[in-house]
């Protein structure tokens, strides 16, 4: 027979004071010590062997005496602490004696902390000990499950707040925060120790996981210390896992190795987490500003990953790992402003594999003189795999420190491969790219080829026909003057299988040898492809004797015109050219630029070889005609006459001959701009309806004696549908109205609305956001069955537009729109029943006038739009009803109508647009809006004495298409 010990302890200072000297012993083979502070509220059920021990605890305990503070357990089958409410353990210090386990010390079996309700939480605060595990120490495993909060703050130890010799796991907790903890050893918060591999796991957390400002500092009494500012694992094969969690943040942690996480001989893995993953401002005295591990993986994340401003005094500003693997992540990944004093500004690794399923950017990372502004690959047989699958990869603004005898200076560098690489593979899916705006350096000789878009990557979901780009486009003027900032070097063979290898904007690519079996190689003015020679950066090497083979050559087009030649230099190797030339301008930038495309333009590629330039299988007869938008014309190709008979040097020329015609790109027409006036129209219409709704014909529906105030929220949407286009507009905000009864039959109202909005036209890359303010006033007069009402509204709308384009940059525009709307109407009651219900007919006239200011966009090739206006005069007619059910204190009231509206005068918005770069103008119109509509409105009011709650809904259908809906609700009080 097995029975379970269950200890219910609620920490209460009054209970403790009543029996401070009480002594109690529990004779149980596994329970070695129960703290005395539990005795005031203790229920004990004596167990026998082979059963888990359960202890239900809660309350707040501050301790000075270890005997009354530390809970010790030793049940081999495990000890479960049941947490029913908040448990706080704080202000305990034991620094003059070496002893592990500040709050909990577990000598055998697994120790678990199990939350049993929504308020279950544990707080460890200011617990300082000279030993391991200021919060919990276990000779076996530790588990935290189903807690609302788990907090550790301001504690100190010689190894972790939570320390175990086996596993430490966190499951199904809601909020975890570890801040300002210090370890004079390893693991500022969590430490795995012992002589067997263990794991730290965070699984299925329902809230944020936060490690902030934790430290692991060195200790003179410990041989290896200062590892893992937040988490440390020592034994080979140990695993640190974050699986299926929400937000994860490591910020401001520090250590000697691994500013946030240290697991030198094990695995650090982030798998399938739904929230953002961020490592920010973590630092280390040695390697791994954020992470130091043998194997790092971040896979299947569905939110952004960020490594920002981490720093290492040696290598790996963000990550120091032998193996780095990033793949199947669905959101953006950014490594930005990480630094390493020696090498690897963001990453130092031996084998690095990165696959982009969304954008991956390495920007503004910096390394010391070992190089690798973004990535440093070192060790035996380093390998690099970069794959742009369904997102692009870009390196920009990364630098390394270049030291000479005279000075040291920053030099741009994205990747440096220190030893002879075993494998370098670059592959981009069709319509995707890998951009190196900073050079790549692989100086150690190797016969293993660099493979670009190799056929082995071909799958039904991946076509290796994308672009690998080496570019100097993002360099500032001072940096461009140093040719080293634009020169990538591979002391290995380079093999282009498919897609495009583009060398542009003055970039240079120097390779051991080059072979092309498919795809295109593109060179823009001032760029070059060269085999290294004695005069190249490879000192002591000689030029390759293998032929430089090109079977698909393209002229790359830069945005700015240039007279510089592109070059292909084969050195001592033969240069063999076959196929036919083409133009590489995937985004059509050349044809949009009047400075280049409106006039004749030439580009040249110089081909040189000390052996022979063989063009016997190359033809220049084909023309390339612009079939895109922009300036029209054709490219003609020819050999410069004075080099035709020169076998070692030839110049290939591409000549652009324009026709003078310009074709506007369809998605640049700008239809969303005049269409945005309908957003202001919707703003005015909604504000006018909200005001008129509370000027009911039956005065009893608004319980106002002299003065009333109404406050509520309102929202509206408007859409148009036709065979050609669809547009969508939405507004959301708040409204307030004051109502004054001037006489028993005359009511004055006034107020305002503040509404935000969004609008766009389907299939156009333009999105407009708006913020508008409306001021309005209304007047209603009742003469028996006849009611006359009028409203006047004035609006100011601030608009901002972003155009998401695939070209060099997005464009942005800002402008104001002004609007006025006035209504005048009358209604007549023709049926009334016992002061509870009436039916009336109505007829109104509504006039709206809206003016948009002229504006010019900013960004690449901006558009200018002239001022435009929208004028609309409509006459709605129909019948309506009102009812009132209740008494003088409590009542349910309602109002509704059905009607028909006809626009008797309409001036649709139309604007003149202009492209300054192209000197081209055109007229653009907003989307078509029908001039007749059917309307349906309903309002319900719940009144109690002078207070009311209301909800109002409007629907307008124009010619069979749902055009607009609005909904408002709020409260009213009268005095």
UniProtKB/Swiss-Prot annotation:
The keyword Transcription does not apply. SUPFAM superfamilies: Autotransporter. Transmembrane segments: none annotated. It is found in: Secreted, Cell wall; Cell outer membrane. Its main location: secreted. Residues 1-51 form the signal peptide. One of its GO terms (biological process) is double-strand break repair via homologous recombination. Residues 699-975 form the Autotransporter domain. Belongs to the PMP outer membrane protein family. GO terms for cellular component: cell outer membrane; extracellular region. This is Probable outer membrane protein PmpA. InterPro entries: Autotransporte_beta, Autotransporte_beta_dom_sf, Polymorphic_membr_middle, POMP_repeat, WDR48. Coiled coil: none annotated. It is a peripheral membrane protein. Keywords: Cell outer membrane, Cell wall, Membrane, Secreted, Signal, Transmembrane, Transmembrane beta strand. GO terms for molecular function: ubiquitin binding.
